[in-house]
């Protein structure tokens, strides 16, 4: 990722503020940010209320510490995806973080969704499972701990929707891995979050746009809880 892009003048305030908060947390021995968010949800969210969990995570991100969740600004995009998916879709998420997007997709798409979410961080797995439990969605969302490149080959069946929101340099190789293992089929929708210029998404975008395998749409957005330009790429396997 082109980290220098985060140092451009329009992005500098966000970058320095986030780095300051991370340093303070490290020096004071605070838990990782996902675990802080988990504790906040347990304290303030209403059990069994998915929207309350999302609202509480939004409040944490706006008032306590920034979170790299999708945030509320992209909920309309998730709702739009429902029109492209069959009833009771199988969803694969790469990158759980705090469980925000898993909860949002389960709440906004279809009550019969079944989501498998792969996450490499143990803290993120713990936080995601706890937040999903508070939301009352543990029976519909499964979290798998491990590197995506190791877990993907162990998956079975096909997925109607794939949500990419993990390490950006893994977007392209993991998508190709999903293809080679037959985990996506014609009509499968692949949503790649954070493909704005700041994330140096060119290898992934070049692949979905020019491989001839996908129809694809680019939607502008902002990085969650900021005004920094971002984008989402929505691709459908032909």
Regions found by a protein language model. Name each.
Residues 1-49:
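N-terminal auxiliary segments of SAM/dcSAM-dependent transferases
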Residues 121, 167:
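Conserved SAM/SAH-binding beta-strand->alpha-helix loop
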Residues 46-49, 63-77:
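Conserved SAM-binding loop and adjacent beta-strand
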Residues 88-97:
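Conserved class I S-adenosyl-L-methionine
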Residues 122-158:
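S-adenosyl-L-methionine
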Residues 114-119:
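Conserved SAM-binding motif I beta-strand of class I
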Residues 170-238:
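C-terminal substrate-binding/active-site "lid" region of AdoMet-derived donor-dependent transferases
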